[in-house]
């Protein structure tokens, strides 16, 4: 999504990437989101329970949502529908102003700034392989 920012995993191992991103494997992806109105308890509950996306004719899976600012929240998804967070917010009556992926499974963005990169550590790779070993591609 060109309107998003944050963590990207780059690899020559397509099978690994498929296992990570495949919705049926329920791997966590975490985002920080800024919207155009205050984050309320009602909004959090609706998002957490799953939201009906009429464009895709599907209800999103339950997810974890936590308020981190007046108009900001953190969301952890185990699904990867196209523009899912933007569509969920739209269905709840708000617009996404900023969307940043901060974690994919055990790999976090940390303090990296836009344009910076780092190699995944041996420990992170070992844990990643352990988590995806039962996953389907």
Model-derived regions: residue spans:
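Basic, flexible Lys/Arg- and Gly-enriched helix-loop patches that mediate nucleic-acid binding at interfaces
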Residues: 2-137
